[in-house]
């Protein structure tokens, strides 16, 4: 899994002008799945995201997790994170997970994360409009392939 984690003051997702999910302070996640992903990747990502300390404490040090601040998460499926750009000018997305598998993993990821932190989500495969107010900005890329290699 590749996940872009953005610390936000607020974020929302709309489809055809209708807001489908909206959060206040927390994380906006752009979530990509590849066919090699497994429950290991899913569990690793959920644990890392829930415990990642990138919110400021009273000393203005990044020391608090999304749980600590009672934040929320907006999760958006994003197959384009697996774009291959080495050849030509049009990206290939063949490295992205097959739609049925990716949808199941994305939904399981959201369900697992929602047991820890409130989660709102976009609609898998939909054309969505995402609005956010970055906080910092703080943006982190989590690639579970690295953890899988070391497991």
Curated annotation (Swiss-Prot):
Organism, scientific name? Lactococcus lactis subsp. lactis (strain IL1403)
The reaction(s) annotated as catalysed by this protein in its Swiss-Prot or TrEMBL entry are: glycyl-tRNA(Ala) + H2O = tRNA(Ala) + glycine + H(+); a D-aminoacyl-tRNA + H2O = a tRNA + a D-alpha-amino acid + H(+)
Q: What is its EC number?
A: 3.1.1.96
Q: Which domain of life is it from?
A: Bacteria
InterPro entries from the xrefs?
Daa-tRNA_deacyls_DTD, DTD-like_sf
Q: Report any one BP term from Gene Ontology.
A: D-amino acid catabolic process
Give the Pfam families listed for this entry: Tyr_Deacylase
Instruction: State the protein's name.
Output: D-aminoacyl-tRNA deacylase
Family (UniProt) = Belongs to the DTD family.
Chief localization class?
cytoplasm
Q: What are the UniProt keywords, alphabetically?
A: Cytoplasm, Hydrolase, RNA-binding, tRNA-binding
Q: Which GO terms describe its cellular component?
A: cytoplasm
Gene3D superfamilies noted in UniProt: D-tyrosyl-tRNA(Tyr) deacylase (3.50.80.10)
Q: What is written about domains in the entry's comments?
A: A Gly-cisPro motif from one monomer fits into the active site of the other monomer to allow specific chiral rejection of L-amino acids.
Q: Gene of origin?
A: dtd
UniProt function note: An aminoacyl-tRNA editing enzyme that deacylates mischarged D-aminoacyl-tRNAs. Also deacylates mischarged glycyl-tRNA(Ala), protecting cells against glycine mischarging by AlaRS. Acts via tRNA-based rather than protein-based catalysis; rejects L-amino acids rather than detecting D-amino acids in the active site. By recycling D-aminoacyl-tRNA to D-amino acids and free tRNA molecules, this enzyme counteracts the toxicity associated with the formation of D-aminoacyl-tRNA entities in vivo and helps enforce protein L-homochirality.
